[in-house]
């Protein structure tokens, strides 16, 4: 019993020591600078002001920093031992029961769970520079906020308010909280523990919310998998994430994710459980059975904000997907600080056309948690389904990708449906043609059309605010989100570019991820020396700090040694009356090295223009002749990511 708890039982890594050690030591150390006698005078404001310099308790530090009390105790003890050469024992003595020992509350130390090696490796990936972590904590950007805490707050303060809404089906915050706790208990009975990864492949339905909140209830990590992915992607992502369970759809019409996961289990050494929503194939568990689990199962662990709680993968439009570990410090602080700047409160109703398996959709999910507002659910996007959902469900805020707006416009739905409930809408995921945003703002006069720039690695990095006006919002992706710093730099030298000049967009802030999981090569080039994340996006910043996205570094076309960005060509082609969407990318050329090829998807019923006609259209808009596309491909439908971004690597090759 006297052996206490060791590092594997507490979940402390050397990387965590490096990030939080100095912060914990400084907050715990008594600096003896007490002034006056506020305690005798009962001057509560002065007492609070003196609290930190006088030294905080481990519990107070845990609440401030976003760690568990035991983690703070361990880190403090080890830091004092290293700094002051004290003889403190590095194991923690945990007798249970608080002030008095109680046999029924005591768990023998050998019976405490231990974080798995995979869980510790994932925790070690959450490695932030100590000076940045200290800055974020001191400014209140990072605090001990978790999905479970927000869920319990909403259930206590707004028990009967809607949390997740489908036509004909509404779950209140109390129902979600109670159901998530039961499912968490069922997962705990299956042997899942803090730090274990659980893959979730579900559409935007209430079961996604239940699974997500249940896994993170006890400190598990949610790994999202997009709905279009099949066996090959499933095997790759579950293997890399080392997932111990997957929650997915059961028996389907043309494909069963649950059956595919069962069939792949021999090639997935960490996958122990397949949990199906709907009809479960033989060998799979049913989510309904977990929902019916014993509500009194005791889970002896509550997560903290520093714990990893998401494992996402980049969309892989130009390369293989990369694993992105994220915690509540990143995601929930970003949502909490962004909500008031968007004017969002508990009285709003948000609908996202983007899937919850993508960070853009999760941004709406997180905003719902931190504000207490309802998420209106669209399980699968089609232009009519989105337009009808807005008309019938009456959201006040809607998340679009530019392709969603283009598809609804091409289908003639903008003038046919009632969009008057929207007070603000957001466009993100790819570059939005300014002409389309101006047209939508004119069609929706009571709604403020805004843009957002984000990535899997950082959620919402920049956005325009509702008060910025369409003049800014149609052209610019936004200005820095709260707490972040954005700059535009030379991609090769790293020197900051003057206002108005194009360069790489780089960002630093409390929402930025710490680095890719098990990908040393990618991490070597992901950050600058002063820890700005290199986005790979090109843009320029105006005098007011607004940033316009002009393309991707990898999309630059090098025609005979002359380099140019094709995004302005894409925007103009998308404005052609016959064209719904367009993409321009380089193709090999024997003499020039590269030349531009245009791919277009036509509006319904439109006749395909030839290359000469399109080039004449571009010349009318004073495009330089060397930028004109020299190849043209008409496609029936573009290959798209789950957030409706064109995957240029999968475009068909032009004819010779």
Locations of regions flagged by a protein language model:
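Gly/Ser/Thr-rich phosphate-binding loop
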Residues: 370, 395-400, 409-472, 485
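AMP-binding/adenylate-forming catalytic core of the ANL superfamily
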Residues: 229-239, 246-250, 398, 509, ...
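Conserved pre-ATP/AMP-binding loop-to-beta segment of ANL
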Residues: 144, 159-160, 281-282, 292-313, ...
